[in-house]
Structures are given as structure tokens and as C-alpha cells.
Swiss-Prot record:
GO terms for molecular function: N-acylglucosamine-6-phosphate 2-epimerase activity. One of its GO terms (cellular component) is cytosol. One of its GO terms (biological process) is carbohydrate metabolic process. Converts N-acetylmannosamine-6-phosphate (ManNAc-6-P) to N-acetylglucosamine-6-phosphate (GlcNAc-6-P). InterPro entries: Aldolase_TIM, NanE, RibuloseP-bd_barrel. Gene3D superfamilies: Aldolase class I. It comes from Photobacterium profundum (strain SS9). This is Putative N-acetylmannosamine-6-phosphate 2-epimerase. The gene is nanE.
Length: 235
């Protein structure tokens, strides 16, 4: 590991990352707005930024001095893997300015092996992050030199999505010696704090910070529920 990589990991340690990924095709889905989100997040104290898409990474890079975790999302015909599925994605993210490159590291049918993607990330001098759904996936990537193991995809590979984050996975991976990025359903400050208590090296927060549509829908649902409860009480 070189000095630049060490500095990036040190910057992320026990901080939190803002995932600046607006709703696809929504009114905030433009590189200029993503760059503004990223700058606002840095002003608020984030340790790093997670950015999707080459043009967005390029737009953000000149404006922030914190580590950028870069990804590319694709909708593939014959695979459920979406996050950085191709080696050319790795090269493009590096050229755009990513410090860390995250991949889907689940044990699902994929166009490119996890091993080849990890090798490509390391070959371009970036830190590797594995977005995992299980303990076994995390340990598999840890054994192959991945520097950051994420709980990102826990609960998202089949069946109902749990309401709570997977704290057990975070703790187990930490106890096994992994540097764990807690990610997935950390939508309150309290949950983010619990991630660190559970052993996370860092925690990523997304929708609760940068997806205005989601945030508004949460408030709308609570207000509607309260109105309904009042109406039923009167009746």
C-alpha cells in the first residue's frame, strides 16, 4: 500500500461517507448538481464521497479534497450484478479521479470475476472496496487483498429488504479482521453511530442525505399516518 492509499484510509477512519447519488432521471440528476451536493457534504464534515458515473466523478473531483469512492451502475441482461461489473469501468473510474473503486462482490452470475476486478483496481493504484451481502463474500474478498469490505448489499440480493441495517454482519467481519464500511439502511444519525459501535471502520449514508424525493416521501408517509390516526379517533 502506498502513502496516498494510506492517507485515504486514514481520512475515512471512523468518519462517514455521503453517497451523492440522486434519483435516476430525477430533477437533481446532473453532474453539476451532484458536484454541488458533494461540496455541501464536505462542508458538513463528511470524510469521503461515494459517486456513481464517470461524468459525475469528473465533475466532483476538482471541488473536493476528500477520498472519492467511485462506482458505475449498469443494468445487465443476464446478471443481477449492477455495481462496476466490467474491467473497463475500473479504468474509467481511475481516469475520472476515483481514489477507491467499489465493486459488487456477491457470489452471483457476473460478466467479470471478482478476482479480475480486484486485480484491475490494484493495478491502477486505487483502493478496492467490496460491496458484499454475506460474511463469506466479505471474507473471500479480504483474503484477496481488498482493503475495504462493505455491508452494502446485505438484504438486497433476494427476498424482502429488512428495515434495519445488518449490524451482526458488521460485527462479525470486524472480529475477523476486516476493515468494514457500514452501508445499507443507515438513515438516521443514531443508526450511523451504532455502526461505529458495532465495529465499522466508516459508515456510508445515502438516501437520508442526498435523495430529496425519498426524504420527502418519509415525511409525507408519517404525516398521512398521523392524519389517519386522528380521523379514526374522531370517528
Amino acid at each position: 500500500m502506498n502513502k496516498t492509499q494510506e492517507n485515504a484510509l486514514k481520512a475515512l477512519q471512523q468518519g462517514f461517507v455521503a453517497s451523492c447519488q440522486p434519483v435516476d432521471d430525477g430533477p437533481m440528476d446532473s453532474p453539476m448538481i451532484v458536484a454541488a451536493m458533494a461540496q455541501a457534504a464536505v462542508a458538513g464534515g463528511v470524510a469521503g464521497i461515494r459517486i456513481e458515473g464517470i461524468e459525475n466523478v469528473k465533475a466532483v473531483r476538482p471541488h473536493v479534497n476528500v477520498p472519492i469512492i467511485g462506482i458505475i451502475k449498469r443494468d445487465l441482461e443476464h446478471s443481477d450484478v449492477r455495481i462496476t461489473p466490467f474491467i473497463e469501468d475500473v479504468y474509467a473510474l481511475k481516469a475520472a479521479g476515483a481514489d477507491v473503486i467499489a465493486i459488487d462482490a456477491t457470489h452471483r452470475v457476473r460478466p467479470t470475476s471478482v478476482e479480475d476486478l480486484i486485480d484491475a483496481i490494484h493495478s491502477v493504484g486505487c483502493l478496492a472496496m467490496a460491496d458484499c451481502s454475506t460474511y463469506d463474500e466479505g471474507m473471500y474478498c479480504q483474503a484477496r487483498g481488498v482493503q475495504i469490505i462493505g455491508s452494502t448489499l446485505s438484504g438486497y440480493t433476494g427476498g424482502p429488504v429488512p428495515a434495519e441495517p445488518d449490524f451482526d454482519l458488521i460485527t462479525r467481519l470486524k472480529q475477523a479482521g476486516c476493515r468494514v464500511m457500514a452501508e445499507g439502511r443507515f438513515n438516521t444519525p443514531e443508526l450511523a453511530g451504532k455502526a461505529i459501535e458495532a465495529g465499522a471502520f466508516c459508515v456510508t449514508v445515502g438516501s437520508a442525505i442526498t435523495r430529496v424525493e425519498h426524504i420527502c416521501s418519509w415525511f409525507q408517509a408519517e404525516v398521512e399516518h398521523a392524519h389517519q390516526a386522528q380521523s379514526e379517533a374522531v370517528a
